[in-house]
Amino acid sequence: FATAAQGARLVKHLTSSTYNYKNGNGITPLELLSDSSLSRGSTYWQCVDSKSCSWTIRFNNPIYLTRLSYFHGRFTNNLHMMTSAPKSIAVYVKLAKSNPAPLEKTLKDLASENVGKDNTFKKDSSYILISNYEYDIHDRRIRQDFPLPDWYIQLKPLIRSIAFVVNQNNGNSEFTSLRKYVINGVTASDLKIIDSNEFTIN
C-alpha cells in the first residue's frame, strides 16, 4: 500500500526535508512511493535529518495493517550509503475516523503500557507509536520484516495514515538514506469480501 499507484500520498508537512548539499542526489521523498524501486538509477532519498528523519503517507482508503518491512541494499564501495542507512525506526499510526469512538483511547492506553508514555509523533500528536524496530545492515537480508505487536494485532485498528521516523542511522551525521518501506494490509471492503466468502479460489 506504500505506492502512488495504490493511491498513497505523501504527507509533506509531516515528512522531513531533502538533503540539498552539493553532493545530494536530487531524489525526493516522493520516490519512495514508486511502484519499482529500480525506476531510476539512484533511488535512495537522502533525508536532511540524521536523527528523527520522518516519512509520512496517507492511504487512499483506510487499511488494516498486516505486515511492515524495510528494504536497503548492500554497498561494499559506498560507505556513505551504509552509514546513512536507518538503524532505529519508530512506526506511528493515525486512526481512521470510521473506527469506534472508544478505540482511540484504547490504542493510546495500550501504547502507554507497551511502548511508554512518550508515544505520540512530535509533529502531530494524532499519530500513535506502536513499536520501535531495528534494521540490521550486517544482516544479509536486504528486506527485513517488522512484526506487528500482538496487542496491536488483537486491537485490529483501521488506519488512515502511517509515519516512519528514523531515530538513528548507522553513523552518518549529515543525512539519512532511505530506499523502500513495504506496507501490506487489507481494506475494510476487502475484509467484507473475504468474510462473506464472495471471493473463492478454485
Residue ranges and their predicted role:
Residues 61-79, 164:
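A short beta-strand element within beta-rich, extracytoplasmic domains
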Residues 18-20, 65, 171-176:
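Short, surface-exposed beta-strand/loop "edge" segments at domain boundaries and coil↔beta transitions
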Residues 26-34, 38-39, 47-51, 76-202:
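Trp- and acidic/polar-enriched beta-sheet ligand-binding modules for extracellular glycan
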Residues 17-19, 42, 133:
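Intrinsically disordered, low-complexity segments enriched in small/polar residues
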Residues 1-30:
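Predominantly extracellular/luminal regions of secreted and cell-surface proteins
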Residues 42-61:
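Short beta-strands within extracellular/lumenal beta-sheet-rich domains
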Residues 2, 56-60, 83, 170-173:
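Short amphipathic alpha-helical molecular recognition features
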